[in-house]
């Protein structure tokens, strides 16, 4: 009999009886840690909390609510079709009296501290009052019963295909009873309707007459050309009613013992003195990735068009005969209201990963959705760029699209989603395929009365272990399939046996390395780092497994003996920075419970100890190597606070900025070489760190060039992260530094991880891309993997796939939880194969397609000139649209730009990418290096906001009393939408800009900033909350955005009258014509012209 898994991963001080609230709440405002909803109104970014001793017992952690079951369906679900393997378990499915494996439903905490559903009496997540139950029929994502089946083409209508987006260029078509322009869909900016034409019209209102018949097939296929369209549609699947929406994970943000908060200004230099007394850090929600709110970066989910409205065209078909090339008119004749722009959505939807045993295309990442895992893994964990797999490499090549997976295995789930089940097979371990080593999953088919199974990945027929056998039902499924999570859930955690362990699971080791050079002391960076570390000590896991260490460095390295037996910490100096060593290794890293008092005393005194330091040098490389030697036997997290360019010792660097001095402009010749590491020293060190499971996170608090391209190699190779605070201000950056450090420590994460993706026969992994170390071709090593990190897995064909069959993908992540348990997280995805090009375009996933384009551009920037990278990104977009225009929409006039519905925003996002920080011809080299590193591990939901930010009108917040969402609908990034009388807020997930027009009403300025004119605003802006409705709403908006982005935005002030501030803000108006490139309208004209050229 298998032993059950202890419920849930261990989290520090999970004591529901603890009288103190979590550190991210206002203490005293709630007595019960579960009463999250009642406390949401207290999440004010400028309210100082009462004193809270940093060394006291840790309050209930953020993700410490009891799990709540997923809302049950209120409608009768249809019986699964025969051979429908995956399916939802019944209500009491997890309680099995016997037989392996045992399933652990996480109790107080799910594995790795994942957020779970809070109590049912709480309002919807986001802290807004409940508006009643969420009825599937009213807000759920369309639940198609899979994808249209391949088959012969249907009838050929006389208009553009359903799902296509025509944009007319030239003179508007004549209006009459039989022809009218498509009406706006109601989204901001008036995008076209996404639905199919009315019954019987077949798109006739933009028709150019019937297509010619008898078109020959093109030369692009060998043998008979496959049909383009099938008669299948996207019918709605079953709907169900969910319970009330749940509250979010608790917020992040308020450090103990905080004083007044100071804001940030991008225009003034921070003072050259040590940090002032601790500031009041805003307390705002810090939760899951961006899902709720304004959904500004994509259209809301819509019913996918049915096939009968699409023309039957032939794969390889060329342009229509006698087709004339219409000249492109001036942009002034284009109806701006018909240009595709991101829309917005409101209420959450419920999304089932499979419906009637067929894959269900995922909703956009910009939609707030609750996933019901019915066989495929949630799209939060794994997304495919195309939700139907092309059967041949030729078909994929013709489409021009990427075939890749974006995998985020530790992603935060929605609070109302079912936590990931933990399955324990005992000493035998999970059932696996003998040939490919794939793990048992819902798509393995059991035969011979359950005595054998067929692997869905390699096709091998294997013997079922005797203690895992079970009879089959009349539908061919195992009778216990719905009772076993591994047979009915796309995502599951297996308990790993000793077979998966090279050594015992590593303890939780946190080592802090602080720059105390003269510049770091004078700018206040050292004091800010010490203050942040001291405040997060209470957030570290408690218990005997938690160890800490600390060291400082300038031109030498200083370790500290923190043994309790000593009256005070003892400094141990390492002067040799060429051949470093660690003195008294056993005394440098000690249990947190033994050294907490000494550690707090040391952190308070470090800024004073080095106050008179005159050493401008930094032995960064040597200090990191010495800290690694101390951690070599255990592994762990090394957090480095760096302020100046490493100049002495191992890995010393010189200022490479443009041979000239000052700043390296990205537009200079061969500038891309400055984005490559100076040498291989730090890279070689990083590979060794990864081998011993040491993850390095880098906090760069600088006011000058630090050669980000070189030093970021360490975190990128070890699964870490780079945080950049440039130019560092002791008045405004400590709040962000504290919140970044706290989230780094408390977010769900795993350690000493190894990941591999397996694919069905015919598809194989081509390449992995992200923050990791790769020593063998098939696996990637991750000393740490957290909920914010994503990995791109590009795929390629190695054989032809069968049309109508399903292609399977399985990602397996072996990792150690924060509590020291070894687990295997398995993600499964099974999606259909198709021979029809039109199906590829219909099922394309814009979010992951663009995320791949973004990551590939970032990978190419260090090795290519910027104009070439921009040109490649634009050409990729044109290739995709040309393929659709040529093979799927050849019946329309060349005077129209036809965009596939699923990818209608691809031109806008491509334009935004070419104008973004990474591809601008001006700017600092370090800024570009940071951008490249940031994009490397960026998750899919954050990819589009990074290049196409969200902008809202702050001055109109008072008028949005009836809005469901805290964050109002976004405004297009076009200067014509900016009023001189308005105040606007723009955010991209990293930075927030407040733009103030020249003629803003003094009452608005008084309410928001407590001044009568913009000239009175101080250079160091402080975001305050005043006693009026507008100020309160703006603070709520900032809090909500920070929660959505899981990021503490650096807020900067941009006044139109100030040249630098105005230029900074205008650089984000990507739809305008400017030095960065063409306007959105001009770009569409250019894309259309190039498509016409290719067609001719």
From Swiss-Prot:
InterPro entries membership: ADF-H/Gelsolin-like_dom_sf, Gelsolin-like_dom, Gelsolin-like_dom_sf, Sec23/24_helical_dom, Sec23/24_helical_dom_sf, Sec23/24_trunk_dom, Sec23_24_beta_S, SEC23_SEC24_subfamily
Tissues expressing the protein: Mainly expressed in pollen, roots, stems, petioles and hypocotyls, and, to a lower extent, in leaves and cotyledons.
GO MF annotations in UniProt: zinc ion binding
Lipid bilayer topology: Peripheral membrane protein
Gene3D superfamilies: beta-sandwich domain of Sec23/24, Sec23/Sec24 helical domain, Severin, von Willebrand factor, type A domain, Zn-finger domain of Sec23/24
One Pfam short name: Gelsolin
Domain of life: Eukaryota
Span list, region Disordered: 1-315
Ranges of Pro residues composition bias in the record: 47-64, 79-92, 108-122, 150-160, 171-186, 246-258, 287-303
Cellular localization per UniProt: Cytoplasmic vesicle, COPII-coated vesicle membrane; Endoplasmic reticulum membrane; Golgi apparatus membrane
Biased composition (Low complexity): 12-23, 65-78, 93-107, 140-149
Quaternary data: Component of the coat protein complex II (COPII), composed of at least five proteins: the Sec23/24 complex, the Sec13/31 complex and Sar1.
Feature: compositional bias, Polar residues: 27-45
Cystine residue pairs: none
Family: Belongs to the SEC23/SEC24 family. SEC24 subfamily.
This protein's UniProt keywords: Cytoplasmic vesicle, Endoplasmic reticulum, ER-Golgi transport, Golgi apparatus, Membrane, Metal-binding, Protein transport, Transport, Zinc
Record SUPFAM superfamilies: beta-sandwich domain of Sec23/24, C-terminal, gelsolin-like domain of Sec23/24, Helical domain of Sec23/24, vWA-like, Zn-finger domain of Sec23/24
Name used for this protein in its record: Protein transport protein SEC24 B
Physiological role: Component of the coat protein complex II (COPII), that covers ER-derived vesicles involved in transport from the endoplasmic reticulum to the Golgi apparatus. COPII is composed of at least five proteins: the SEC23/24 complex, the SEC13/31 complex, and the protein SAR1. Acts in the cytoplasm to promote the transport of secretory, plasma membrane, and vacuolar proteins from the endoplasmic reticulum to the Golgi complex.
PANTHER family to which the protein is assigned, alphabetical: PROTEIN TRANSPORT PROTEIN SEC24 B, SEC24-RELATED PROTEIN
Binding sites annotated in the UniProt record for Zn(2+): 433, 436, 455, 458
Region (Zinc finger-like): 433-458
Any one GO BP annotation for this protein: intracellular protein transport
């Amino acid at each position: 009999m298998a032993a059950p898994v202890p419920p849930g991963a261990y989290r520090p001080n999970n004591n529901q009886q603890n009288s103190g609230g979590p550190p991210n709440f206002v203490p005293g405002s709630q007595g019960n840690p579960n009463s999250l909803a009642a406390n949401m109104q207290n999440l004010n970014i400028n309210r100082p909390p009462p004193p809270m001793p940093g060394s006291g017992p840790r309050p209930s952690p953020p993700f410490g609510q009891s799990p709540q079951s997923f809302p049950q369906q209120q409608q009768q679900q249809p019986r699964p079709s025969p051979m429908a393997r995956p399916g939802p378990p019944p209500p009491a499915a997890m309680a099995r009296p016997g037989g392996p494996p045992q399933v652990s439903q996480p109790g107080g905490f799910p594995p790795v501290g994942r957020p779970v559903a809070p109590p049912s009496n709480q309002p919807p997540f986001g802290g807004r009052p409940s508006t009643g139950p969420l009825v599937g029929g009213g807000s759920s994502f369309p639940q198609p019963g899979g994808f249209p089946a391949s088959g012969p083409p249907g009838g050929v209508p006389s208009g553009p295909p359903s799902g296509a987006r025509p944009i007319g260029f030239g003179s508007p078509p004549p209006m009459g009873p039989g022809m009218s322009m498509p009406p706006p869909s109601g989204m901001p900016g008036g995008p076209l309707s996404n639905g199919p034409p009315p019954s019987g019209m077949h798109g006739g209102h933009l028709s150019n007459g019937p297509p010619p018949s008898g078109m020959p097939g093109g030369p692009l296929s060998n043998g008979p050309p496959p049909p383009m369209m099938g008669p299948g549609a996207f019918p709605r699947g079953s709907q169900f009613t969910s319970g009330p929406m749940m509250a979010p994970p608790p917020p992040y943000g308020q450090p103990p013992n905080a004083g007044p908060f100071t804001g940030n200004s991008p225009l003034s230099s921070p003072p050259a003195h040590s940090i002032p007394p601790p500031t009041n850090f805003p307390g705002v929600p810090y939760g899951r990735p961006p899902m709720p709110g304004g959904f500004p970066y994509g259209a809301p989910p819509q019913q996918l068009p049915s096939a009968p409205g699409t023309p039957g065209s032939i794969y390889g078909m060329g342009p229509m005969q006698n087709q004339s090339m219409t000249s492109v008119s001036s942009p002034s004749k284009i109806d701006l209201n018909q240009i595709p722009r991101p829309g917005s959505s409101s209420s959450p939807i419920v999304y089932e990963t499979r419906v009637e045993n067929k894959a269900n295309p995922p909703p956009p990442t910009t939609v707030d959705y609750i996933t019901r895992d019915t066989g495929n893994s949630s799209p939060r964990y794994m997304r495919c760029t195309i939700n139907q797999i092309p059967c041949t490499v030729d078909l994929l090549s013709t489409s021009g699209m990427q075939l890749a997976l974006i995998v985020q295995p530790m992603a935060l789930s929605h609070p109302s989603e079912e936590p990931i089940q933990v399955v324990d097979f005992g000493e035998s371990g999970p059932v696996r395929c003998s040939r490919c080593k794939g793990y048992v999953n819902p798509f393995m088919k059991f035969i011979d009365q359950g005595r054998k199974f067929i692997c869905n990945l390699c096709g091998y027929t294997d013997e079922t272990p005797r203690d895992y056998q079970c009879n089959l039902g009349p539908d061919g499924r195992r009778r216990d399939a719905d009772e076993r999570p591994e047979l009915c859930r796309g995502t599951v955690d297996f308990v790993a046996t000793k077979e998966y362990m090279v050594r015992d699971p590593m303890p939780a080791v946190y080592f802090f390395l602080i720059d105390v050079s003269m510049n770091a002391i004078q700018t206040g960076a050292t004091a800010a780092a010490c203050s942040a570390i001291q405040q997060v000590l209470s957030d570290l896991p408690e218990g005997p497994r938690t160890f800490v260490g600390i060291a400082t460095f300038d031109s030498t390295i200083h370790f500290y003996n923190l043994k309790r037996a000593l009256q005070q910490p003892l400094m141990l100096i390492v002067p040799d920075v060429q051949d470093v060593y660690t003195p008294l290794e056993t005394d440098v890293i000690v249990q947190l419970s033994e050294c907490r008092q000494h550690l707090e005393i040391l952190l308070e005194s470090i800024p004073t100890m080095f106050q008179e330091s005159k050493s401008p040098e930094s032995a960064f490389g040597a200090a990191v190597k010495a800290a690694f030697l101390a951690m070599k036997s255990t592994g762990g997290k090394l957090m480095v606070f760096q302020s100046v360019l490493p100049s002495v010792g191992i890995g010393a660097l010189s200022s490479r900025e443009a041979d000239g001095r000052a700043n390296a402009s990205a537009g200079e010749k061969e500038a891309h070489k400055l984005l490559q590491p100076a040498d291989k020293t730090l890279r070689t060190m990083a590979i060794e760190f990864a081998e011993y499971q040491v993850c390095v996170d880098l906090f760069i608090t600088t006011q000058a060039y630090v050669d980000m391209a070189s030093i970021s190699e360490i975190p990128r190779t070890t699964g870490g992260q780079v945080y950049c605070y440039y130019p560092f201000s002791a008045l405004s950056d400590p709040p962000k530094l504290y919140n970044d450090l706290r989230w780094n420590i408390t977010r769900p994460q795993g350690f000493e991880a190894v990941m591999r993706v397996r694919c069905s026969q015919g598809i194989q992994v081509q390449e992995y891309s992200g923050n990791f170390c790769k020593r063998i071709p098939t696996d990637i090593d991750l000393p740490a993997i957290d909920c914010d990190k994503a990995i791109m897995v590009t795929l390629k064909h190695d054989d032809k796939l069968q049309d109508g069959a399903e292609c399977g993908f399985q990602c397996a992540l072996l990792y150690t939880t924060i509590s020291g348990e070894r687990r295997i997280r398995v993600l499964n995805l099974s999606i259909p194969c198709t021979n029809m090009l039109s199906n590829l375009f219909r099922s394309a996933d814009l979010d992951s397609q663009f995320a791949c384009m973004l990551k590939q551009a970032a990978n190419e920037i260090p090795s290519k000139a910027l104009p070439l990278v921009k040109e490649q990104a634009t050409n990729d977009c044109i290739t995709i649209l040309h393929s659709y225009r040529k093979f799927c929409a050849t019946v329309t006039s060349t005077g129209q730009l036809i965009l596939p519905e699923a990818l209608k925003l691809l031109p806008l996002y491509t334009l935004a990418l070419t104008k973004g920080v990474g591809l601008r011809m001006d700017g600092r080299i370090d800024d570009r290096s940071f951008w490249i590193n940031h994009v490397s591990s960026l998750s899919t939901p954050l990819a589009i906001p990074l290049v196409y930010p969200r902008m809202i009108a702050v001055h109109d917040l008072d008028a949005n009393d009836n809005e469901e969402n805290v964050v109002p609908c976004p405004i297009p990034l076009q200067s014509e939408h900016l009023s001189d009388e308005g105040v606007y807020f723009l955010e991209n997930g990293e930075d927030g800009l407040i733009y103030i027009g020249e003629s803003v009403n003094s009452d608005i300025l008084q309410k928001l900033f407590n001044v009568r004119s913009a000239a009175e605003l101080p250079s160091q802006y402080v975001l305050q909350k005043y006693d009026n409705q507008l100020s309160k709403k703006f603070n709520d908006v900032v809090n909500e955005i920070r929660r959505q982005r899981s990021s503490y935005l650096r807020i900067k002030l941009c006044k139109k009258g100030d040249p630098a501030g105005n230029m900074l803000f205008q650089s984000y108006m990507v739809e305008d014509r400017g030095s960065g490139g063409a306007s959105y309208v001009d770009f569409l004209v250019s894309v259309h012209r190039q498509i016409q050229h290719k067609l001719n």
